[in-house]
């Protein structure tokens, strides 16, 4: 009975707050002469703060047009903006900037949804050793990470040198599908020097950029490495979940002035690999069995950073040269 009453009170409070919010929006429109979309665009700076407010306003609207606008095809965005302006009785000649601002926001919102679909498609595609394209990507990964060491054969214990678990890497891609391979190859190709350094450090953590004095100060005398490729696939899983949960909206809405793309996602992966590598060394785990603890602590730190509406996980290395800050 108590549970039922608690649920009833929560439902009543929800509808009461919703009613009050609609009343407040009505009063604000009468006082300012502007609808909620206008107030957001005129009073909030471009980036995640504005786009996320616009997204919430559209999604929670009573209008079917506004509700569905967040999932239209990119080619239909311009017409959708015209329809919204007409619905809200806003003259585009008097308010030319509003249409431009709304279009920028919708490009980001729709682009984020499409990015999830693109990433999900790669995640669901299994690695196929009979597919020449898949095999070529895998062999390129080796060449980028070990340019001076030829791979003796496709099935080889050498794969363990770059962090795979066995002599055939295809079994390690089961969890993240081709997405894991795409990310690893992107990191190794676009930021070869950094990727090779991270690989070297993962094998020999004491040979990293920390000086001997810093090692002693941080008491990292027992520092251990990790499996580069396996951790890369695991960080791919982290990036994927941040994307699907919406946590990465803050980042993408701040760095992509239009629709975020797969390249933006891969650049984010590169950033996470850099940051996790530093975090792992700083945490100085006793053994590899502490990986899940360190990863969870790292995940919480990233999520906390992304709760800041001004946050952008902008890496300062070669792979990030294509990023555009707003």
UniProtKB/Swiss-Prot annotation:
Keyword line: GTPase activation
Xref: Pfam families: ELMO_CED12 (PF04727)
Domain of life of the source: Eukaryota
Entry GO MF terms: GTPase activator activity
Lineage, top ranks: Eukaryota, Metazoa, Chordata, Craniata, Vertebrata
Residues covered by the ELMO domain: 133-306
Disulfide linkage: none
Protein's recorded name: ELMO domain-containing protein 1
Function as written in the Swiss-Prot or TrEMBL entry: Acts as a GTPase-activating protein (GAP) toward guanine nucleotide exchange factors like ARL2, ARL3, ARF1 and ARF6, but not for GTPases outside the Arf family.
Taxonomic source organism: Bos taurus (Bovine)
Listed transmembrane segments: none
InterPro entries reported for this sequence: ELMO_dom (IPR006816), ELMO_domain-containing (IPR050868)
């Amino acid at each position: 009975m108590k549970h039922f009453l608690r649920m009833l009170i929560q439902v009543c409070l929800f509808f009461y707050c919703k009613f009050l919010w609609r009343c407040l929006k009505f009063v604000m429109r009468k006082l300012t002469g502007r609808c909620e979309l206008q107030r957001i665009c005129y009073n909030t700076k471009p980036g995640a703060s504005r786009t996320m407010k616009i997204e919430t306003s559209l999604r929670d609207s009573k209008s079917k047009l506004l509700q569905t606008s967040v999932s239209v095809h990119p080619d239909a965005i311009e017409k959708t903006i015209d329809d919204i302006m007409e619905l809200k009785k806003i003259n585009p000649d008097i308010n030319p900037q509003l249409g431009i601002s709304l279009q920028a926001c919708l490009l980001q919102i729709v682009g984020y949804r499409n990015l999830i679909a693109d990433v999900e498609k790669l995640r669901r595609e299994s690695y196929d050793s009979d597919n020449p394209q898949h095999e070529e990507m895998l062999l390129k990964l080796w060449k980028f990470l070990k340019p001076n060491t030829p791979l003796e054969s496709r099935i080889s214990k050498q794969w363990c040198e770059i962090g795979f678990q066995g002599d055939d890497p295809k079994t390690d891609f089961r969890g993240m599908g081709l997405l894991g391979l795409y990310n690893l190859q992107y990191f190794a190709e676009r930021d070869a020097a950094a990727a090779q350094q991270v690989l070297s450090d993962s094998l020999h953590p004491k040979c990293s950029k920390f000086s001997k004095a810093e090692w002693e100060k941080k008491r990292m005398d027992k520092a251990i490495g990790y499996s580069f490729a396996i951790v890369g696939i695991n960080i791919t899983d982290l990036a994927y979940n941040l994307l699907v949960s919406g946590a990465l909206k803050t980042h993408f809405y701040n760095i992509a002035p239009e629709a975020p793309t797969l390249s933006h996602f891969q650049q984010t992966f590169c950033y996470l690999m850099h940051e996790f590598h530093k975090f792992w060394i700083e945490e100085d785990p006793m053994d590899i069995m502490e990986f899940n603890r360190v990863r969870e602590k790292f995940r919480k730190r990233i999520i906390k950073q992304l709760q800041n509406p001004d946050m952008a996980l902008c890496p300062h290395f070669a792979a990030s040269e294509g990023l555009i800050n707003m």
